[in-house]
Amino acid sequence: FREIYSRYDNCVAAFMSHFTLWSMCAEQKEEFTIFEHDAIIVNDIPEYLPYKEVCSLGKPSYGKWNDPKTFGVNPLTSKRYFPGAHAYRLRPTGAEKLIEQAKIYAKPTDVYLHLDTFPLLQEYYPWPVEARDTFTTIQKTEGCLAKHNYNEEYKII
């Protein structure tokens, strides 16, 4: 968690909120769809998605990315890690894997969800969810510069 882009305590707190939902998903043995506060649904999300364990629903919210080549569920293509953890769906088996790995090490949630650690990560395209953030409680200025919504009115709280 110690990196130049985020404030340590806030970043850990955000990760733990996701971790808590992963734990609930695993314990309840139910599929979960997780949204962060800035997630806006811009297109229909199919009730049934033929994904394996963890599937991003969110359009990349920072930096450069690659568009998946086909519509529907694809291997994670936009980046090597989730392009923001603002919207994703997971099955209990995926939640269990995320929890087990977090016992070994953890990082900011989006970069924690990385293909090198979790090769079955997928994403749904076209992305039905976008992050429309106007503030952050997690990032430092360095972490905001690549955000697509970052401008002079963006607040670092």
Language-model segments: residues:
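An acidic/histidine-cluster motif and surrounding catalytic segment
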Residues: 1-35, 39-157
